[in-house]
């Protein structure tokens, strides 16, 4: 019998990711009349709970992300605090991040993933990004959201074949630009756009360059901008001529070469203007290559790739079943009252590092 840890109205089960500033748990929430829901609960680590700047960023993440309701973006349910410990409750995705999938597929077969599948995944990400980029406030004014950290760790694929963008932690709405000190680099170096490196004002095209890097790496099975140091990596992004993906993987068709290189144009004016433009080209390629790749195909691929992991996850979930069965029968016997402090909860949690499907952003 495994016992979860009470935390406010939630029961924390396995810790599914931990970074330098926050940790993410699989958690369960209960309501009246048998209502219950699994969530991913992202909580600031106790040692930085007093860091006002990070707390502001954490709150900004929730405020931006809660405005977004789209099939290809992880849904935020709640921002709150328990005993001064801030947390965000969000949609729980049973699946893997793109980095883990990429590494597993490469180890399994040693060959790059099918270009059709990659085009399908990137097209779904384009849909989510386009929605975020075009989001307007209640008065109908564009909010100007730029994700700023589009990378394989921030893209999840569920075992059902759903593709989701996570972690708007470094996203900034343009009307909040006063919060951003000019020239501060945020995001992962190897996935930054040239204008991001230079500390220039960003628009949606910066995210498309970052997505272009992800696209290229999936197509070739190799990292694109990896230098001997962070400085070298940034120099590569600014100066390196990028050969077409087909030069590294002959399976990549010409149409995909063109889409990939257009997203990676150093000059923003030569890049796709909107994610919807890139999506249109990807869809045209997919529809002209029958049989069309579907969500079911993606689900099948993922379930095959992570068959053993899925079985282990089922066992972990089953270990909590007796506790939750008892709780459902007799809720009064489980009054949470003395919620353990966030530090105690952290120390007592089993740390499951079997996957990192909810990323830590700046952690």
Predicted regions, residues:
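C-terminal lobe helix-coil module of Hanks-type protein kinase domains
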Residues: 153-156, 190-338, 342-356
């Amino acid at each position: 019998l495994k016992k979860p840890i009470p935390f406010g109205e939630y029961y924390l089960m396995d810790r599914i990711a931990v970074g330098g500033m926050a940790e993410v748990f699989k958690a369960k929430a209960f309501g009246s009349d048998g209502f219950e829901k699994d969530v991913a609960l992202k909580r600031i680590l106790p040692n930085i709970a007093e860091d006002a700047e990070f707390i502001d960023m954490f709150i900004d993440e929730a405020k931006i992300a809660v405005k977004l309701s789209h099939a290809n973006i992880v849904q935020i349910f709640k921002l709150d605090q328990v005993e001064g410990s801030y947390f965000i409750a969000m949609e729980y995705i049973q699946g893997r991040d793109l980095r883990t999938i990429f590494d597993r597929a490469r180890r399994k077969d040693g060959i790059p993933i099918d270009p059709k599948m990659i085009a399908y995944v990137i097209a779904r990400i384009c849909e989510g990004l386009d929605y975020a980029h075009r989001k307007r406030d209640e008065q109908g004014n564009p909010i100007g959201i730029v994700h700023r950290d589009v990378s394989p760790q921030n893209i999840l694929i569920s075992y059902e074949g759903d593709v989701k963008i996570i972690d708007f932690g470094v996203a900034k709405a343009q009307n909040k630009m006063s919060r951003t000190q000019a020239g501060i680099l945020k995001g992962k170096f190897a996935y930054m756009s040239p204008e991001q490196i230079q500390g220039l004002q960003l628009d949606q095209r910066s995210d498309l360059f970052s997505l272009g890097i992800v696209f290229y790496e999936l197509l070739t099975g190799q990292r694109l901008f990896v230098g001997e140091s962070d400085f070298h990596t940034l120099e590569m992004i600014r100066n390196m001529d990028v050969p077409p993906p087909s030069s590294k993987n002959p399976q990549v068709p010409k149409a995909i070469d063109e889409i990939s290189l257009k997203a990676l144009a150093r000059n923003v004016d030569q890049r796709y203007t909107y994610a919807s433009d890139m999506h249109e080209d990807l869809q045209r390629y997919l529809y002209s290559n029958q049989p069309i790749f579907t969500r079911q195909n993606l689900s099948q691929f993922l379930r095959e790739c992570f068959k053993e992991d899925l079985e282990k996850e089922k066992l972990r979930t089953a270990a909590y079943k007796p506790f939750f069965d008892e709780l459902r029968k007799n809720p009064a016997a489980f009054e949470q009252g003395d919620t353990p402090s966030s530090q105690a909860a952290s120390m007592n949690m089993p740390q499951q590092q079997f996957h990192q499907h909810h990323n830590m952003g700046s952690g």
